[in-house]
Regions:
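Fe(II)/2-oxoglutarate oxygenase catalytic core
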Residues: 1-135, 141-167
């Protein structure tokens, strides 16, 4: 995956909503690139959507209609203390249709320190395995964060699927 998308440039991540007026680096510090859905990357979209469908069919039974965005390839650099504070992947306007979020752990856990993906639910907080290749799917309304990376480089893929309003 890394080699396949290497020609796509990274840029500094933005956030969709910043109602509190926080400076961006207080909320998130990472670099991203968007992997287009095309003939080259179609296999990746198909595979990730299979994971989403399996998780949804077994756990939530949401009405999913489509992938809502391109796949986000994210880098958190230890020399920048890269992180993404507590947030939800839903919000106003187009973000209102997100129902499931998917994260793929691309980095080997020995390549970085810190950078835990933590998810909060009614059952408390859970830290996701750092094992390379781990795929986690969760409802987009759950609070989650990536703790500061204190060394090395953490890389991941993120994808969202959605549909009409919850019923």
């Amino acid at each position: 995956i890394k080699n396949e998308v290497a020609p796509i440039p990274f840029h500094r991540a933005q956030i969709a909503s910043n109602a509190e007026g926080d400076a961006l680096d207080v909320v998130r510090k990472s670099n991203i690139k968007w992997i287009p859905k095309n003939e080259t990357h179609g296999w990746l979209y198909d595979r990730l959507m299979q994971y989403m469908s399996i998780a949804n069919n077994n756990l939530w039974h949401f009405n999913l209609e489509s992938i809502l965005d391109s796949i986000q390839y994210t880098q958190y650099h230890g020399n920048e203390k890269g992180f993404y504070g507590w947030h939800m992947d839903i919000g106003p306007q187009e973000l209102a249709f997100r129902k499931l979020s998917l994260v793929v752990q691309l980095s080997n856990p020995s390549d970085y320190s810190g950078g835990d993906l933590q998810i909060r639910s009614g059952h408390g907080e859970a830290t996701v395995s750092k094992t390379q290749g781990t795929v986690i799917v969760f409802p987009s309304y759950l609070l989650h964060q990536v703790t500061p990376v204190t060394g090395g480089l953490r890389e991941s893929l993120v994808l969202w699927s959605g549909g009409n309003s919850y019923k």
